[in-house]
Amino acid sequence: MRKPIIAGNWKMNKVSKEALDLVNQIKDEVHKTEVEVVVCCPFTVLSQVQKALVGTNLKLGAQNMHWEEDGAYTGEISANMLKDIGVEYVILGHSERRQYFNETDETVNKKVKKAIKENLKPIVCIGESLEEREANQTFDVIKKQLLGAFEGVPAEAMDNVVLAYEPIWAIGTGKTASSEEAQTVIAYIRSLIEEKYGVDISEEVRIQYGGSVKASNATEIMNETDIDGALVGGASLKAEEFLGIINF
């Protein structure tokens, strides 16, 4: 039985006071121990949020990291830096990173390997654009991204990996893949994992859906067989809405 995982991706939002206000509104309301809940904050508030999460059911996540240990990489953050302040999860390969910061399957692969090596749990994002979907290329794109991200990653490393299917056309647009559409693609992702790593691992790896998830559609999405959670964007910035998703 795969434990559902709901991760809130705050993106570039919330200064210190706002971050703590939001965490304080939700931390005592997360009682469902059968659901794992992660808040993925901007780097600037991670340390403060970590302190606020002590003794709660919430886990701490970051939104990105570099694949090198340290060095002359101005503006970057390493896995060790994240571990040092208590980060457990890290989002890698988000479509906005690919779109605006030229991330590729190759750089995502380097980050995945480094995260695993440093015992961080990567939430690895894959998904197609509207143009690719309309050209019936969804499965081709998904396969390329998934195999690229996990090139050279051994089977035993998959225990702590989470995948997130985030169709780019549904991110921040208000459009949402129907639960059936999401299930179809996520079932395909699971079949790719089975091909690469075998049936046991494919049945254990958790796969989230991300793309305009909100309280009103969370239950329908989460009821699908292969969907094990949600990577939540805008709705995670509002306590009531995020709690509505967590308590689907």
UniProtKB/Swiss-Prot annotation:
Principal location class: cytoplasm
InterPro entries noted in UniProt: Aldolase_TIM, TIM_sf, TrioseP_Isoase_bac/euk, Triosephosphate_isomerase, Triosephosphate_isomerase_AS
Quote the protein name from its UniProt record: Triosephosphate isomerase
Catalysed reactions, as listed in the record: D-glyceraldehyde 3-phosphate = dihydroxyacetone phosphate
The record's listing under Pfam families reads: TIM
Q: Which UniProt keywords apply?
A: Cytoplasm, Gluconeogenesis, Glycolysis, Isomerase
Q: Where in the cell is it found?
A: Cytoplasm
What domain of life is recorded for the organism? Bacteria
The UniProt entry's sequence similarity note says: Belongs to the triosephosphate isomerase family.
Enzyme Commission (EC) number: 5.3.1.1
Which pathway does this chain act in? Answer: Carbohydrate biosynthesis; gluconeogenesis; Carbohydrate degradation; glycolysis; D-glyceraldehyde 3-phosphate from glycerone phosphate: step 1/1
Q: Where does substrate bind?
A: N9, W10, K11, G172, S212, G233, G234
Q: Does the keyword Nucleotide-binding apply?
A: no
List, alphabetically, the GO terms of the cellular component aspect.
cytosol
Q: Which GO molecular-function terms appear in the entry?
A: triose-phosphate isomerase activity
Q: How does it assemble?
A: Homodimer.
Single GO biological process annotation from the record? gluconeogenesis
Q: Which residues form the active site?
A: H94 (electrophile), E166 (proton acceptor)
Q: What does this gene product do?
A: Involved in the gluconeogenesis. Catalyzes stereospecifically the conversion of dihydroxyacetone phosphate (DHAP) to D-glyceraldehyde-3-phosphate (G3P).
The scientific name of the source species is: Alkaliphilus oremlandii (strain OhILAs) (Clostridium oremlandii (strain OhILAs))
